[in-house]
Amino acid sequence: MLWSTSGCSAPRPDNLGLKNNLLLSCPKSPNCVLSQVSDAKHKIKPIYYATSVEAAKERLNQVILSMDGTRIITQNEVYWHVEFTTRWLRFIDDVEFYFPESEALIHLRSASRSGYWDLGVNRKRTKGIRSRFEELAKGD
């Protein structure tokens, strides 16, 4: 039982945010994925869009709000931080979005706060976010 409660009580990590227009790197553990990295263990694709950045943000906001267990922590011009709480064990994962001013894409980073393995949860979550975003884009 201690294992299930430790996830929700994990403090917000220090390795969040932007530095030199980059999301911070993933730890060596496999429970993090990032679109601004080259190693295959952590690499994911960014989200591309063909609209204005404002329309892309609106679409991404729709996607986030449609998902269970979300809590928006930071939402400014170029950076968003969202906490995702898993349904059963109540673990908190941190998902970050970066909107570079000169590119029509959204960079992502998704990381578990606790543990070493995530059974692919962060990779699946980012794929799901990208899929839902692209599905909404088809309606434009």
Where are these regions (language model features)?
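Ser/Thr-rich, low-complexity intrinsically disordered terminal regions
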Residues: 3-140
